[in-house]
Amino acid sequence: MRNKTCGELRASAISANVQLCGWVDRRRDHGGVIFIDLRDRSGTIQITVDPDQGQDLFSIAESLRNETVLQINGLVRARPDEAINTKIPTGEVEVLAKNIKILNTVTSTLPFSVSIHDEESVKEEIRLKHRYLDLRRERMNNNLRLRHNTVKAARSFLENEGFIEVETPILTRSTPEGARDYLVPSRVCGGEFFALPQSPQLFKQLLMVGGVERYYQVARCFRDEDLRADRQPEFTQLDIEMSFMEEKEIIELNEKLIVSIWKKIKGIDLQTPFPRMTWQEAMDRFGTDRPDTRYGMELVNTSDLFSKSGFKVFSNAISSGGCVKCITIEDGNNLISNVRIKPGGDIFSEAQKAGAGGLAFIRVRDDKEVDTIGAIKDNLTTSQIKELLLKTQAKPGDLILFGAGPTNIVNRTLDRVRQFIAKDLKIISDNELKTQWNFLWVTDFPMFEFNSDENRLEAIHHPFCAPKPEDIGESESLWKDKLPNSNAQAYDLVLNGLEIGGGSLRIHNSELQKTVLEVIGLSKNEAEEQFGFLIDALAMGAPPHGGIAFGLDRIVMLLANEDSIRDTIAFPKTQQARCSMAKAPANVENKQLEDLHIASTWIDPD
């Protein structure tokens, strides 16, 4: 139907007869000559319709609405000098139309403009409801192509490194760890359910047992969890696993993968090795295991200064096993008012959202005296003030914000406040947001954390991570006692405060795997029922192996400078886990439920 695309025409095509297809981006009538901007996936080209070419042709052009689908035959010619458009790649040429064929018309009112000339902001709910139109827009078109090129770059690198792509099952079994599963009832096996995979974790390990050695997959994953801007119920991982590799080797290989992607997509030469930081250091300095290292305001532990303070909020927090930490905002006295920090203020509210009762603060004055509201200053000695300023490196004009209480809440609070203030004060400029790439490996995660709701230990990553050998020793009889306090050979890759990948060395010893499952509270029968196939495989000569899974949607979001992964997915779900375009999920006929041996107990509250 066409021999050229709209966006590829340049001065070199002058005098060529071309046949184009595309959509009417806009139509303009200038002094008896009609100009049509014709758009396809490659860009736009100006079509000129002259009445000298025939009244029938001109009448067709006069009738065209935006988004009408056309096939146009015409002659490429140079634009007059005064009409050259340097803002678009095809701006030196135009096509003189010889014939216009309408392939389809627009019979409904468009809910929003698709034209590249209209940068109108459209509500996301409208965009998602009419996603097929949204995909015609330049921004979404570019994002999908960037996504394709990212996957293409990853595949090219991995295949050159000897990896093969292997598909793993979508219908698998439900396991108790991690987020809620999406369940699929079995018609054939009444009363039994498949689960959609939260990741290909167990199957990729079994591929290593099977001798594949180097595997990757662009894997679809499903998690029934609460949503936010960078989460979806169904998402895509670049999943990688390899045998006979140590942690250092896996990290180095995946750095090369990231470098290759950034070079091909952004034309940027990233510097390696990426910085590394232990989980403990990240929590101490930033209050989070995915710190944004593009700016300072690091957390400072001041518990030693306040342990015997007369300020009971602080001293009681410390005596109860918690801590007192602070962040320092440079020139905060001029930038942040008391109203914002006190109850009802936006910064105070951020602290409350993280679980804190509030924030305490100190302002450093020009004479290095401190000023505050409440009892903090009254309960600080001159030497304590001096030590505080030394420890925080606070200067005159700076604002110090404090959190006190259980360590996990203090960390979470100051991390949230730190991010909020950095964004609010534009500590990172808009240009830096788009051009600064701060990668960081976070390593040495604890194997477990305590789940107070269930009164048991649970794996921080998953129960298949290998512990550090030096933490558990070689004596199997001591593993159960040593595992709860051990660190995992686990590593996350963080970019600008977002986790883009996570992995670990895996347990390849069946007895150690049994012990880990016992530590998280599974009985022998439960472990056998849920993971017996893995334990059996590990007992049959499983090689040392490890890997990583990258969040493809999140990586593309960052490469595209978008704020939400929904803008990098062709047909995403809303934050209510719905497809507003196809109206899914939806009710089904009772007959379908009967065939599956299930019934719905849902009662519509309306």
Curated annotation (Swiss-Prot):
Catalyzed reaction equations: tRNA(Asx) + L-aspartate + ATP = L-aspartyl-tRNA(Asx) + AMP + diphosphate
CDD domains on file: AspRS_core (cd00777), EcAspRS_like_N (cd04317)
Annotated L-aspartate binding sites: E177, R223, H461, R506
One BP term from GO: aspartyl-tRNA aminoacylation
Listed SUPFAM superfamilies: Class II aaRS and biotin synthetases (SSF55681), GAD domain-like (SSF55261), Nucleic acid-binding proteins (SSF50249)
InterPro entries: Aa-tRNA-synt_II (IPR004364), aa-tRNA-synth_II (IPR006195), aa-tRNA-synth_II/BPL/LPL (IPR045864), Asp-tRNA-ligase_1 (IPR004524), Asp-tRNA-ligase_1_N (IPR047089), Asp/Asn-tRNA-synth_IIb (IPR002312), AspRS_core (IPR047090), GAD-like_sf (IPR004115)
Top-level taxonomic group: Bacteria
Coiled coil: none
Pfam families attached to this UniProt entry: GAD (PF02938), tRNA-synt_2 (PF00152), tRNA_anti-codon (PF01336)
Location of the region described as Aspartate in the Swiss-Prot/TrEMBL record: 201-204
Keywords, comma-separated and alphabetical: Aminoacyl-tRNA synthetase, ATP-binding, Cytoplasm, Ligase, Nucleotide-binding, Protein biosynthesis
Primary residence: cytoplasm
Oligomer status and interactors: Homodimer.
HAMAP family tied to this protein: Asp_tRNA_synth_type1 (MF_00044)
Similarity comment: Belongs to the class-II aminoacyl-tRNA synthetase family. Type 1 subfamily.
Protein name per UniProt: Aspartate--tRNA(Asp/Asn) ligase
